[in-house]
Amino acid sequence: MTAFGAIRITLDLLAARCDEAKEAVDDKAEVMSRSLSLVLLCALTTGASAQATPAAGPVPPGQRAEPARKDTTPGFVIRDQAVIANCAGCHVRDSAGHMERLSYMRKTPEGWESSIRRMVVLQDVRLDPAAARAINKYFSNHQGLAPAEAKPARFEAERRMIDHQYTADARTERTCRACHSLGRVMSQRRTRDEWELLLATHRAYYPLVDFQAFRRGGPPPPDSAGAPHPMDIAVTHLARAFPLRTPDWAAWSATMRPPRIEGEWVLAGSEPGRGPFSGRLTVTRSATADDEFTTRATYQYARGGTVVTREGRAIVYTGFQWRGRSNESGAPADSAWREVMFVEPGWQEMSGRWFKGGYDEFGMDVSLRRLSAGPVLASVYPRALRAGARNQQVTVTGANLPRETQAQAVDFGPGVRVEQIVRADPDSLVVRVAVDSAASVGARDLFLAGAALRGAAIVYDKVARIKVTPLAGMARVGGAAYPKQYQQFEAIAYHNGADAKPDTEDDIEIGPVDVAWGLEEYGVTFDDDDVKFVGRIDQRGLFTPNLDGPNRQRSGNRNNIGDVWVVATYQPDENGNGARPLKARAHLLVTVPLYLRWEPWKGEP
């Protein structure tokens, strides 16, 4: 797309908005003020738009001709009355049932929710919450994503802060990632025309984006007059990689239905800083909708034995996208955790992330398996079994476990022998194991009473190194005017594998270990003493940032932002020989609050 082409699209959009403004001008003063501004803008743009656009035939009174589309991919017919009643005033519906813009895109529930919020905030659309939820549900179900399309970008919906690398096109990644993750892009499907209109939207909302983000390397060289703009390159790639119509969506939409997931589920997971947990989730179908459910989860942390009960509700969009919200018993109503999970085909497994926080930074990874008549294995704690260890107590959790079982029936594989059954009940089995000193290092599957758990335990002979995760963390000061963004760290132990070399493909992850945590200065600016002002870290690895705003105790009256090293120190206890401590560190950036956000900090999903 040339610069003139981009201007033409923008002018067409402005002309369309001008038509809406003219139709909306009535005797209401609040509407008159807003509409007059747009009408004045029309006077400056209509002439240029008319010159850029070929003359069209006569348009019947009260209708607006839909702009000619270069991409002839057929759009989706929209029949929902709530959508038509609330959206057709601007998004014109043609005789076949296609609506401008809306019929030519597909998104996740979060993507449609953001569009609805943007219409309310920026276009003054008056929409009550019930209608907004109904519209979001309709589009998520009828113009959503197939499982194969949604899974590569699930980290976006699960609000994970990860270092994702988009490898399909490096130029597109450079163009888009300056402002948002590629997960937001990968969670959408559009026609080429819609991708181009999205470009126009970016330029309309952010007029300096061409120079601040799209050309981050500076202006183009003088001899590049014919070179395509970075956004033109991105649009070409996105239209090819993420088109509106795909075989995956055609196949999924043909068989899509509300999942029948009511009943008991075995829950297992891990929360950074608190460790693994296991329990049960009871799912009850709503009496009013087949895709809405109420939930009750009860689970216990392996370290410390804390028992948590949560009650909530959930909607499953597009037949597989679980979106829920639950509260811990006795906790304030505003402390709810959001739940994002994927229901696997067959309706026997679910997995995802539950999270909370001002920036969704607190979270736990969860996996669920449907409970049937037979035994189900959920987790093993501790997973790490040291070679040569004797009388090591291990707890196996699950459901429908046999009360009467023999030690030899609990099979951890070669080199691991169960010597004693300490306690057995339907939800847990406590055993004592012995590991041969010559046992091969690596993962072990567990088999018990016809049930299996892949990678249930890890056999190791020594801890070669530790790694702090995340390797690059970020926190935001807050607490005065904006919420704080915390950062949770974990220390993971590793075995170097058969080649005895670190950071190679055969390395074995042993799992989280208890360490001593501390902060050290990150040498960026001489004598800035960031470590004194940015915040503190506790012995669970949780970093708490300082207050936002200027600090009079700091030179230059600066904010409490900066860079520090997060340092973990681990003392191995292998055969009681007092091995030397192992250290690892990660970089932590403590920055300012996120001052401008499209999405509110709190609200209904």
Which stretches of residues belong to each language-model region?
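The canonical Cys-X-X-Cys-His
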Residues: I84-S95, I135, T172-R184
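Gly/Gly-Pro-rich "capping" loops immediately C-terminal to redox-active cysteine motifs
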Residues: V92-L122, S181-P207, T309
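Central antiparallel beta-sheet cores of small beta-barrel/beta-sandwich binding domains
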Residues: H180, T255, P259-G346, S351-G358
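Edge beta-strand at a domain terminus
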Residues: P247, T255, A336-S379, A584-L594
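Immunoglobulin-like IPT/TIG beta-sandwich domains and homologous Ig-like subdomains
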Residues: G388-A451, I510-V513, E520, D530-V534, ...
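Beta-strand/beta-sandwich contexts
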Residues: R369-Q408, D425, L453-D503, P600-E604
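C-terminal capping alpha-helices of c-type cytochrome domains
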Residues: D124-R154, L208, A213-W252, M256
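Electrostatic cytochrome c docking/interface patches
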Residues: A52-V83, L122-D124, A131, A146-A170, ...
